[in-house]
Amino acid sequence: AESAQNILPAADAAAYNRGKKRRSLAFRICMHVLMVLIGLILVFPYVLMISKSLMTTEEIIGAELILFPAVPQFSNYLQVLQDNNYLSALGNTMFVIIFNLIAVPLSATFIAFGFARCKFWGKNVLFGFMLSTMMLPAVVTQIPLYSLYNTFGWLNTLLPLTIPNITGGGAIYIFLARSFLQSLPKDIDDAAKIDGAGPLRRYFFIGLPLCKPIIVYIMVNVFTSNWGDYYGPLIWRLDDSFPDTFAYAVFYSFTDQNVGSDTLNIRMAAGVLMS
């Protein structure tokens, strides 16, 4: 009798565990299906853009809905690179990117080195003030910056997209570089001071070479933010004499009412290159 009583609870527990496993498996399957559906929904617009970029004009503007081209037209991408408007805009973008790829990591690590490895009066107060700028939405500073750049004569040029970045490119990069530099042993500075190295020499020969990981991170972020930036050129642009960037040229080609639908495949190809 006692063995039978022991067997029944064990059987119930086993049945409960099997049911729990089945419910858990069903839940996981449902979650995976849901995530796949969400992923497909998110990827579909980009896949459609790539598909449209490989179509002929007739396939795009035709009455019949076509999702994929009969014969991929890779020549559409060559037409983008042969278009003078896109080509000059691409050159302007590369100039902005190369300038900022050099200026932002150097200036951010240089400023961060002062906060992390040097001693001067009011350092913590100044650093806290700098961090407080991170709480300001970018739109709050647009009107003051517009007025300032107008006074300098920078509007309708690429200067607003480059020169301000020699101050670190934003408090977040300085904060990250400072945190990285603070993690380095202080003995390195002490040894350099004994050898007679000043702050500048310690930065260029010790701090900067050791900052390679954070520099790579900053450069990746600088590249992606500048490559896809059309908001900045949109603000500082006054007329058609502005040296358009590639992202703005693509944006303008989709919003300009004077551009016909017969070039939609070329514009889609430009959008793929920009993305």
PLM region spans:
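Transmembrane alpha-helical segments of polytopic membrane transport and secretion proteins
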Residues: 1-36
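A structural signal for multi-pass alpha-helical bundles of membrane permease subunits
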Residues: 27-275
